């Protein structure tokens, strides 16, 4: 497999790729087919490639998170492109690579939020959408999956509720208190309270929670 490794994933990555077959062998040691695999030093994306292949072979529901500091653009130009190629079956130049593997792929850039913000909890809430999407495996599209961060948003949503026939779930700040009428209106929709644990450590450090 090391002799064929340069062809895997449809991207070039000298002296760094790991054989997909080898990583799949490691993953097969886990009985569960519903695990989350973290590669905190991702390079060419072999781990993600292996997870996708194994899911296709045995019908598993494994997920993966690939992390890299994007040095020299490695994440954008190598890791992301490889996983995209495996999923779509098309190389970056448009040529055929494979039949593809149906899957979802999200790319996030991380950054630091200053602890000197006057109200850190309000600032962190601006970034809560990414956390919700990662945990629940959904896309907050404002139609099927909607966030409600304050009472004014709840009022507007209720006022225009007839315009949202496809709503499946609401993700609601714990500070929002629905009225009796709103509870009746939203009764057929899954409601998830946005939990403190997303940023509990950070808020405890600055004394906004305990």
What are these regions (language model features)?
Residues 8:
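ATP-dependent phospho-/nucleotidyl transfer catalytic cores
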């Amino acid at each position: 497999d090391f002799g064929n490794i340069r062809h895997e994933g449809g991207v070039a990555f000298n002296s760094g790729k790991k054989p997909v077959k080898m990583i799949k062998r490691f993953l097969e040691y886990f009985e569960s087919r519903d695990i989350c695999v973290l590669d905190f030093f991702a390079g060419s994306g072999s781990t993600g490639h292996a997870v996708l292949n194994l899911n296709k072979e045995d019908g598993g529901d494994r997920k993966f998170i690939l992390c890299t500091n994007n040095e020299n653009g490695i994440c954008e130009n190598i890791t992301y492109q490889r996983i995209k190629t495996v999923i779509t079956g098309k190389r970056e130049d448009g040529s055929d690579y494979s039949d593809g593997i149906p899957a979802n792929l999200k790319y996030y850039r991380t950054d630091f939020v200053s602890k000197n913000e006057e109200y850190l909890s309000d600032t962190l809430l601006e970034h809560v959408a990414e956390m919700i999407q990662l945990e629940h495996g959904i896309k907050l599209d404002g139609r099927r999956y909607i966030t409600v961060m304050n009472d004014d948003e709840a009022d507007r949503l209720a006022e225009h509720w007839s315009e949202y026939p496809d709503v499946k779930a609401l993700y609601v700040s714990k500070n929002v208190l629905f009225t009796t009428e709103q509870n009746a209106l939203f009764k057929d929709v899954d409601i998830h309270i946005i939990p403190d644990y997303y940023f509990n450590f950070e808020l405890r450090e600055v004394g906004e929670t305990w």
